[in-house]
A protein has these predicted regions:
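Short beta-strand-centered aromatic/proline hotspots
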Residues: 167-171
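Short, well-structured alpha-helical interface segments that form or flank functional binding sites
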Residues: 16, 20, 24, 122, ...
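Active-site nucleophile-adjacent alpha helix/oxyanion-hole segment immediately C-terminal to the catalytic cysteine
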Residues: 1-73
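Conserved active-site-adjacent core of cysteine acyl-enzyme catalytic domains
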Residues: 56-162, 172-174, 179, 189-193
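Extended aliphatic helical segments
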Residues: 11, 20, 46, 50, ...
Length: 202
């Protein structure tokens, strides 16, 4: 349930139980910029909406023969460390993920939230492509801290891919949005985080 959360916070709730920050941070940015299709971004059934949007993007990449991007997404997701519950991503496949989404049809939000394998890794290039391909937004990727509003990528350890990228968040003004919450700074969200990339668009 949304409780007392703002609509902008509601956009990111799915990331509080799945690793889907590449999508939810993008949704937050799109919502803040008053982009259309707002019914996708908040309200009831948000888990199902998020999964449907991810499936649509993956199916679009398959239909358009974007095998390189699909391989990057698959490889990045396989590099996820096991979760606290022991969920392992080392055998993740795009087709298996789509099948899992298909099996989610008709399940309750509460049941879906428990399934950590709905997580998926989005390399920076894939986030930029998603904005362009699915939302017709020309995004700019900067592999350093620019201080600009946008989707920020952070690191906290020595993960092997994309400069240690471990999470995406949305920054607007002096606020950071992630996991369905609002923070006054990146360090308030996690003191170990440091910004390593910014994806901006208008």
């Amino acid at each position: 349930m949304s409780g007392n959360k703002t609509k902008l916070e509601q956009v990111g709730i799915a990331n509080s139980y799945w690793g889907v920050c590449g999508f939810t941070s993008t949704f937050a940015a799109l919502y803040q910029l008053n982009t259309g299709r707002k019914s996708l971004l908040h309200g009831g059934g948000v888990t199902t909406k998020v999964l449907a949007e991810i499936k649509t993007y993956l199916m679009t990449l398959k239909a358009e023969g974007q095998l390189g991007l699909l391989h990057e997404i698959q490889t990045f997701t396989r590099a996820f460390p096991p979760t606290a519950k022991g969920t392992d991503f080392s055998t993740f496949t795009i087709d298996g993920y789509i099948d899992r989404i298909n099996l989610a049809v008709g399940k309750s939000d509460e049941d879906l939230k428990k399934e950590e394998l709905h997580s998926i890794g989005m390399p920076p290039r894939a986030v930029v492509d998603y904005l362009n391909r699915m939302w017709q937004k020309k995004a700019t990727l900067s592999l350093f801290e620019t201080g600009a509003n946008g989707i920020i990528g952070v690191r906290k350890d020595n993960r092997p891919m994309y400069g240690g990228l471990c999470h995406y968040m949305y920054r607007y003004g002096s606020k950071i949005y992630s996991w369905g919450q609002t923070f006054s700074s990146v360090k308030k969200a996690n003191k170990e985080y440091s910004v390593i990339l910014v994806i901006s668009f208008s």
